[in-house]
């Protein structure tokens, strides 16, 4: 079957090649410049088989050659072999401007999101209407217990139950079918996994039980008495259908789990107060008789009932202590136990308030995520603008429109008006996801080459083949009207129509410079939006930021202290005990740095003295030894002539390095 259908497809594409080559004469030359298959697949000039020409086939210049009659001889450099059909889903490509196909999985996903993940006003209207219907059915069930409205409510309830059973049964089947869009619910076992969810089990029980009650418990159009009781219970279960996501129970469970320690403590102490107060009241009142001659606290169970009614502040008044001892015990334990039994309500209330505030803060934080993503994207685009890679500039190149005339041998002019009406629709997205709509990507246009510029302008051809959306870098031509006026023809000849750039190789330096400027502007705008989104939510956030900053500062100070200890040593290493006892304030960092500077200054002075001494020894060695005996003293002098009398070198001291290394002179040499 595939082999039989391939020849017509090849002939159709070859016919399209012939019309394409007749309208664009520069395709072969551009194809030689872009021989790579990747560039041809990206929508280059050589890969324009699936796109419409800029001018229609009929609008050719007088000097241009006529299209070839037979498409069997393609130009050199272009291989026209049979090409397999492209089976890619356009929803997968980010550069696709077509709307997603209504496939089976796509419909399943939309239905699943509508029923299981309601968002938007349509979902709200649907689920709120279901809630009102279930509530109305419950109201009629209540009215059926009143004798005045029993006849009317029972008949109406019968038909409402039939409608609800059919509706909920159909909805259950649709939910089961739409769950196949998720990977974990695919197939029979996946559907069973979906049916094992608690809310799905409740829906199935309600539907099946309602069908059984309608089939067995009805007599004509009226329910039996036993069936009415079953219907009431099922209507109560239907109220669980309203909250299918279980958000209420999850919220309650999270609050209880967070404050579980406080709740357990208060309930434990309150329970201890309850049993102790009930026991002591029972001991005091077990023999007391009331006015009617009856013992009210005849058992410990009666005392426990009185304790529960008292500590929960209900106070039925059916059992009252009679003796003063019992009243005193009851009053003391009531004040103590009631305070603990009232604490869980306050704990849960504060927990719900904190949970709501946490959700609001999370929403405020979630607003920063798109702003941060936009800032990162624009910063990366500014960095990538210096890269000559073709993928950097691909988003600014317009993909030519798919030609409708290439797919059929005989074009139908009736559809051109429909294409002209719908041409603005796909360009709204421009192949960019909805999250990137904040960053507008302009398309670039350029002047047409001289060899491809026709003598007579065909405005309709441009209008039908090129989709125009005015952007920052594009000048959209105004709508021209052909008339018989010679002056208007002269005005029309002076106009220049801009053709969209369809390949990266057509970009010039001024295009790239303009793109860099636009990207830099988008970066500054995204930075400003991110700074606005980073504003604190309330005063607590400001205090938290300050405390976090203070904590970071203290950590850095401790790290600096540790490095100073490693560099200049700890105070206990070079400070004597006497100084520690005199002044403990000298252990500060400033005092330690001053001591280090003093030590460095002393070392510098000693090095100067040693240097002067070496110079003196060198001069003595070159000038000869001193005459006379006695102790030999070396007085190293500085540049200003100051003598350091603290350094003496007696003759009977140990020999120096110079004395050991320099050879001694003989007596004849000395004379």
From Swiss-Prot:
Q: Which Pfam families match?
A: Ion_trans, KCNQ_channel
User: Per the record, which residues fall in region Interaction with KCNE1 C-terminus?
Assistant: 536-573
- Give residue ranges on the Extracellular side: 144-154, 220-227, 285-300, 322-323
Q: Which UniProt keywords apply?
A: Calmodulin-binding, Cell membrane, Coiled coil, Cytoplasmic vesicle, Endoplasmic reticulum, Endosome, Glycoprotein, Ion channel, Ion transport, Membrane, Phosphoprotein, Potassium, Potassium channel, Potassium transport, Transmembrane, Transmembrane helix, Transport, Ubl conjugation, Voltage-gated channel
- Record field: intramembrane: 301-321
Q: Where is the composition biased (Pro residues)?
A: 64-74
Superkingdom: Eukaryota
Would you tell me the Gene Ontology cellular component terms?
Answer: apical plasma membrane; basolateral part of cell; basolateral plasma membrane; ciliary base; cytoplasm; cytoplasmic vesicle membrane; cytosol; early endosome
Q: Which Gene3D superfamilies match?
A: 1.10.287.70, 6.10.140.1910, Voltage-gated potassium channels. Chain C
Coiled-coil positions: 586-621
Task: State a single Gene Ontology molecular function.
Answer: outward rectifier potassium channel activity
Q: How is its activity regulated?
A: PIP2 molecule is essential to activate KCNQ channels by inducing the coupling of the voltage-sensing domain (VSD) and the pore-forming domain (PD). Upon channel activation, PIP2 disrupts the VSD-calmodulin/CALM interactions, causing the release of CALM from the VSD which triggers the opening of the gate. Calcium potentiates KCNQ1 channel current through calcium-bound CALM. Calcium-bound CALM competes with PIP2 to stabilize the channel open state.
Q: What does this protein do?
A: Pore-forming subunit of the voltage-gated potassium (Kv) channel involved in the regulation of cardiomyocyte excitability and important in normal development and functions of myocardium, inner ear, stomach and colon. Associates with KCNE beta subunits that modulates current kinetics. Induces a voltage-dependent by rapidly activating and slowly deactivating potassium-selective outward current. Also promotes a delayed voltage activated potassium current showing outward rectification characteristic.
**Similarity-based family:** Belongs to the potassium channel family. KQT (TC 1.A.1.15) subfamily. Kv7.1/KCNQ1 sub-subfamily.
PANTHER family linked: POTASSIUM VOLTAGE-GATED CHANNEL SUBFAMILY KQT MEMBER 1, POTASSIUM VOLTAGE-GATED CHANNEL SUBFAMILY KQT MEMBER 4
Instruction: Report what the protein is called.
Output: Potassium voltage-gated channel subfamily KQT member 1
Organism source for this protein? Cavia porcellus (Guinea pig)
From which lineage does this chain's organism come? Eukaryota, Metazoa, Chordata, Craniata, Vertebrata
């Amino acid at each position: 079957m595939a082999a039989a259908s391939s020849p017509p497809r090849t002939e159709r594409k070859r016919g399209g090649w012939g019309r394409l080559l007749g309208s664009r004469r520069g395709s072969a030359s551009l194809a030689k410049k872009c021989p790579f298959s990747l560039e041809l697949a990206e929508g280059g000039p050589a890969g324009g088989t699936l796109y419409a020409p800029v001018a229609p086939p009929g609008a050719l210049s007088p000097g241009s050659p006529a299209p070839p009659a037979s498409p069997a001889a393609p130009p050199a450099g272009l291989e026209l072999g049979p090409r397999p059909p492209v089976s890619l889903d356009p929803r997968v490509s980010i550069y696709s401007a077509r709307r997603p196909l209504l496939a089976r999985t796509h419909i399943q996903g939309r239905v699943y999101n509508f029923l299981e993940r309601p968002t938007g006003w349509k979902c709200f209207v649907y689920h709120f209407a279901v809630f009102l219907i279930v509530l109305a059915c419950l109201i009629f069930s209540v009215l059926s217990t009143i004798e005045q409205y029993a006849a009317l409510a029972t008949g109406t309830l019968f038909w409402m139950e039939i409608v609800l059973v059919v509706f909920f049964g159909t909805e259950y089947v649709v939910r089961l079918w739409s769950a196949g869009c998720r990977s974990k619910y695919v197939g029979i076992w996946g559907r069973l996994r979906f049916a094992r969810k608690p809310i799905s089990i409740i829906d199935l029980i309600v539907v099946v039980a309602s069908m059984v009650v309608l089939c067995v418990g009805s007599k004509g159009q009226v329910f039996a008495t036993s069936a009415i009781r079953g219907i009431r219970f099922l209507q109560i279960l239907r109220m669980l259908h309203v909250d299918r996501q279980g958000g209420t129970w999850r919220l309650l469970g999270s609050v209880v789990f967070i404050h579980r320690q406080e709740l357990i403590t208060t309930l434990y102490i309150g329970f201890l107060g309850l049993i102790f107060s009930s026991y002591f009241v029972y001991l005091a009142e077990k023999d007391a008789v009331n006015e009617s001659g009856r013992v009210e606290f005849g058992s410990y169970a009666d005392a426990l009932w009185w304790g529960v009614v008292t500590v929960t502040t209900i106070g039925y008044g059916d059992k009252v202590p009679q003796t003063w001892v019992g009243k005193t015990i009851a009053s003391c334990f009531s004040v103590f136990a009631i305070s603990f039994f009232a604490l869980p309500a306050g704990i849960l209330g504060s927990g719900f308030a904190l949970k709501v505030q946490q959700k609001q803060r999370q929403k405020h934080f979630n607003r920063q995520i798109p702003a941060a993503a936009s800032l990162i994207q624009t910063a990366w685009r500014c960095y990538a603008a210096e890269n000559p890679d073709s993928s950097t500039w691909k988003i600014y190149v317009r993909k030519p429109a798919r030609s409708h005339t290439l797919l059929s041998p005989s074009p139908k002019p009736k559809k051109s008006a429909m294409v002209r009406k719908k041409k603005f629709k796909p360009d709204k997205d421009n192949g960019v996801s909805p999250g990137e709509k904040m960053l507008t990507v302009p398309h670039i246009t350029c002047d047409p080459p001289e060899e491809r510029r026709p003598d007579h302008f065909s405005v309709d051809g441009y209008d039908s083949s090129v989709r125009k959306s005015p952007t920052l870098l594009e000048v959209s031509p105004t709508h021209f009207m052909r008339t018989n006026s010679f002056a208007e023809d002269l005005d029309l000849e002076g106009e220049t129509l801009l053709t969209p750039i369809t390949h990266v190789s057509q970009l010039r330096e001024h295009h790239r410079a303009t793109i860099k400027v636009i990207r830099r502007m988008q970066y500054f705008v995204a930075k400003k939006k991110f700074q606005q989104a980073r504003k604190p939510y309330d005063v607590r956030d400001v205090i938290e930021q300050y405390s976090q900053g203070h904590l970071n500062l203290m950590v850095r100070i401790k790290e600096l202290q540790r490095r100073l200890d490693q560099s200049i040593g700890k105070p206990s290493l070079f400070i004597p005990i006497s100084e520690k006892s005199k002044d403990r304030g000298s252990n500060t960092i400033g005092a330690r740095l001053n001591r280090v500077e003093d030590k460095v200054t002393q070392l510098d002075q000693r090095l100067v003295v040693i240097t002067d001494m070496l110079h003196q020894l060198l001069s003595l060695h070159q000038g000869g030894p001193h005459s006379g005996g006695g102790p030999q003293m070396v007085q190293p002098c500085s540049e200003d002539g100051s003598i350091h009398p603290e350094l003496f070198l007696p003759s009977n001291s140990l020999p120096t390095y110079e004395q050991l290394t320099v050879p001694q002179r003989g007596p004849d040499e000395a004379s």
